[in-house]
Structure formats: structure tokens, C-alpha cells
């Protein structure tokens, strides 16, 4: 008799995706982040659902409803902090996942890579709208500053901003629609994740060597289910330590003050995972130029497969490219640091240099280094 998991219409989809899936035998722990991102998404949806049961999307009660969740709801504080810090873990895994894709040449799986970029944009939009919901000082001013960037779009900019706000400033209408979108987007993300996996399973996973895995594959279960569980344990341990010992470590103290449209915080800055893009935005004196640079800082990922001129897919045996990759990583750390600093000398100059280096590395230096490596290997 054939096993039910191979014949049942629903179970056979699960089986071919997570049990009998042929996987390369040599993929390292860097391939764990896909499953960890799935776990993060599940944590965010579950905790978010419980928070939505007690939250009110109204400017007069939003802040106090979050306080009520933390003080009066059973285990409300832990749900709130799991959700807030879960977002940080989500982005940490996302950045490592994208970095692994760049290092090992996974961007040659074009459909998977491009849907991944769409997912990154969607997750960033969701996180931004979620940050507005507690209606603290940084929530309000962050929403005002970031949505106002759209006014840089020629001709339609001002109308577009007022349309998004639902009025002439960030107010009740803005908060209500942000809550609606913040609630629905994770489910859209879940659907996109399925499409991401669909395209990945069409081609099969890449591996650290960047070579074809067709000759040597093993079933996903039990080998990689166990490996993913180990990664999940580390993720949950880190998240638990963060939530129980230092829940506000990655947050902004200004967000414990209710939103006040008449008082601007001394330094408006987003959460840590947006700081690199915020630094790039601030490094360009022109408003429209800054907005374009901000969008391009993420959209540039879509250009990477076009700039791929190396004969070797992975960077594993390309030491010069490895050096450039780690310089890019250090540059992103620098941009993240600069994004959290005040707009004054020398931070502005450092930010401008780091921004130029970021785009130069991806668009010019790394392809040039790949060309040199090809010549060195006489290819």
C-alpha cells in the first residue's frame, strides 16, 4: 500500500516540499535562515493576532491600549515584546539570508531571487506600519517624516501624501489604515513565501560550492529537519533572552511618550533594521535624490544577477570577491551606525562616503574584481 503522504492531495504537497524533497548533501547552516524566517513569520502572525484583540486603532486610545496590553492583559507584556523583538529577529535573519544568497551566488535562480526582493520590500512596509501603531512620539514623527518623502515625487507628490494620510497631516485616518494594512500584509507575505518556495523547488537549492547538486541529493527529512530544528532552538533562545532580560534594548525611549504633534523629538530615527537605508537617504542633500537612493539601496539587489560576469557561481574559491563582500558588510554596519547619529559633522561626511562606497562596490568594484579573477584563472 502506498503511503498516504504520497497520495493525499494536500499531504503530497507537504511531502514534496518538506519530507521527500531532494536537497543537496552539502548545504551548510547558512541555508537554515529560510526555515527560521518561516518560524519568525509564524511567531509574528500569532503574537500580532493576540495583540490585535486588545489594540484600538484610534489616536486617542492607541497609546493607552498598548499600555493596557502590557499592564492588564494576562501575559500581555510578553506577547507585546515577543512581537516587537520578533521583528528584529525577522530582519536579522532576512539580512543574513540575502547575504548568503549574494555570497554563494543564489541570485542566479532569477524568479526565486526577484520574489525574495518583493518579499523584502513587503516586510519592510509591514514593519514600518507596525512601528506607527503604538502612537508614541517616534511612531508619529517617523510616520510623518517617511510618508512625507513621497512629496518629492514630481507633480503628484503632494496629492499622494495627502491621499496616504487621509487628510492634511498624520492623524486618525492614517492610523486606522496603517493598522488595516499591517494586519493584512503578513498574510500576503505568507502567500508570497509559497510562491518563493514554488520557484525554489522548480530548480532545487544552490549549494556552497555553486556546482550542480543533481548527482548527490538526500531527502530533506530527517537530515535537514533536525538541522533546522537546531537553528530554531538558537533563534528562540536569542529571542527569549532578549524579551526576558532586555526587551527595550532595540527600541527607542521616545516611544514611551504619547504622540505629540506640537513637539518634535531631537533625533528622529527608525528602528535599527532601517538605519542603513535612512543613512543613505540623509547623505544626499536633494529630497528627490535621497528618495531615489533610498529605494535603490534595496532595488539594487535586482541588478546583481545582471552584473554577474564571473565564471564561478559561488565566492567560496574567489578570495578577492570575498574581501569585497566583507568590505560591503562592514560598509553596511557603518551605514547602520551613521543612521542612528545626529545630522552633524563628521557623521554626515562618513555617511556620504559610506553611501558612495555601497553603490560603487555593488555596481562597479565587485563586477570588476570578478573580471580580474576570470583573467587570473585564464577563463
Curated annotation (Swiss-Prot):
Amino acids binding a ubiquinone: 201
TM annotation in the entry: 33-53, 77-98, 113-133, 178-198, 226-246, 288-308, 320-340, 347-367
Binding locations of heme b b562: 83, 182
Membrane-topology descriptor: Multi-pass membrane protein
Pfam families recorded: Cytochrom_B_C, Cytochrome_B
Main location: mitochondrion
Domain of life: Eukaryota
Places the protein is found: Mitochondrion inner membrane
Positions with a binding annotation for heme b b566: 97, 196
The record's free-text note on cofactor binding: Binds 2 heme b groups non-covalently.
Any further remark recorded for this protein: Heme 1 (or BL or b562) is low-potential and absorbs at about 562 nm, and heme 2 (or BH or b566) is high-potential and absorbs at about 566 nm.
Similarity remark: Belongs to the cytochrome b family.
Protein's name in the database: Cytochrome b
Species name: Microcebus ravelobensis
Amino acid at each position: 500500500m502506498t503511503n498516504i503522504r504520497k497520495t493525499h492531495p494536500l499531504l503530497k504537497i507537504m511531502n514534496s516540499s518538506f519530507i521527500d524533497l531532494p536537497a543537496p548533501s552539502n548545504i551548510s547552516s547558512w541555508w537554515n535562515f529560510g526555515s527560521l524566517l518561516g518560524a519568525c513569520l509564524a511567531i509574528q502572525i500569532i503574537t500580532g493576532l493576540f495583540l490585535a484583540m486588545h489594540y484600538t486603532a484610534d489616536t486617542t486610545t492607541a497609546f493607552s491600549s498598548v499600555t493596557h496590553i502590557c499592564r492588564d492583559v494576562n501575559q500581555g507584556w510578553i506577547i507585546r515584546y515577543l512581537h516587537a523583538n520578533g521583528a528584529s529577529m525577522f530582519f536579522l535573519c532576512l539580512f543574513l539570508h540575502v547575504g548568503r544568497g549574494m555570497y554563494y551566488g543564489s541570485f542566479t535562480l532569477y524568479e526565486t531571487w526577484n520574489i525574495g526582493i518583493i518579499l523584502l520590500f513587503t516586510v519592510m512596509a509591514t514593519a514600518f506600519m507596525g512601528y506607527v501603531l503604538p502612537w508614541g512620539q517616534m511612531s508619529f514623527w517617523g510616520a510623518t517624516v517617511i510618508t512625507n518623502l513621497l512629496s518629492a515625487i514630481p507633480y503628484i507628490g503632494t496629492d499622494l501624501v495627502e491621499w496616504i494620510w487621509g487628510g492634511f497631516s498624520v492623524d486618525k485616518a492614517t492610523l486606522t489604515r496603517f493598522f488595516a494594512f499591517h494586519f493584512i500584509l503578513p498574510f500576503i507575505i505568507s502567500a508570497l513565501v509559497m510562491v518563493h518556495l514554488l520557484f525554489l523547488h522548480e530548480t532545487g537549492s544552490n549549494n556552497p560550492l555553486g556546482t550542480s547538486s543533481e548527482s548527490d541529493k538526500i531527502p530533506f527529512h530527517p537530515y535537514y529537519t533536525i538541522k533546522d530544528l537546531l537553528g530554531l532552538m538558537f533563534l528562540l533562545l536569542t529571542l527569549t533572552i532578549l524579551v526576558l532580560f532586555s526587551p527595550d534594548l532595540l527600541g527607542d525611549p521616545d516611544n514611551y511618550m504619547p504622540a505629540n504633534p506640537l513637539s518634535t523629538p531631537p533625533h528622529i530615527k527608525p528602528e535599527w533594521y532601517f538605519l542603513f537605508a535612512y543613512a543613505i537617504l540623509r547623505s544626499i542633500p536633494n529630497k528627490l535624490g535621497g528618495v531615489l537612493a533610498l529605494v535603490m539601496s534595496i532595488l539594487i539587489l535586482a541588478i546583481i544577477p545582471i552584473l554577474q560576469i564571473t565564471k564561478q557561481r559561488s565566492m567560496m574559491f574567489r578570495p578577492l570577491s570575498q574581501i569585497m563582500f566583507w568590505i560591503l558588510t562592514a560598509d553596511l554596519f557603518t551605514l547602520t551606525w551613521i543612521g542612528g547619529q545626529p545630522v552633524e559633522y563628521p557623521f554626515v561626511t562618513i555617511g556620504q562616503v559610506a553611501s558612495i562606497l555601497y553603490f560603487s562596490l555593488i555596481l562597479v568594484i565587485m563586477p570588476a574584481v570578478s573580471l580580474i579573477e576570470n583573467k587570473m584563472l585564464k577563463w
